[in-house]
Amino acid sequence: EIKEADAILSLACGDGTQTIVKNLKDKPVYPANNTLFIGEVRRVGEFEEACKACGECELAWTGGICPVTMCAKGLLNGACGGARDGKCEVNPENDCAWILIYDRLKSINQLDNLLDIKEPKDYSKSGNPRSLSLKKKEATAKA
């Protein structure tokens, strides 16, 4: 069917569309979506952003709730103080990430995780655009 097609309409994210382009060099490929985030399906037609692929995962000490993604300000050392009724001051439709993190850590008896001051995130580790190779590097011959 692809051979007969004049073009390809990709329903994938931007990465998926680019993968198709690399494999179908003789056909135009058009994206049907504007990728805004890496997310999860909440329910049909509703999605939640889950990861910004920052290169320094914070989930181990935050009880599995990402402050980089879930906090509108990307704060790493606790809430900004602007939340009202558990909602984010930047977008009141969203729960405050730090209230969620606090509640989660309390429920798993790990509130001590909040005592350490976190250094600013090193976003250079995300190094956009990135590539990844799973091939083993050949050992360099020693002279």
Each model region followed by its residue ranges:
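N-terminal glycine-rich "phosphate-gripper" loop used for MgATP/nucleotide binding
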Residues: S10-G14
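Short, well-ordered alpha-helical microsegments
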Residues: G16-Q18
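Iron-sulfur (Fe-S) cluster-binding modules
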Residues: E1-I8, K22-T35, G39-W61, I65-A143
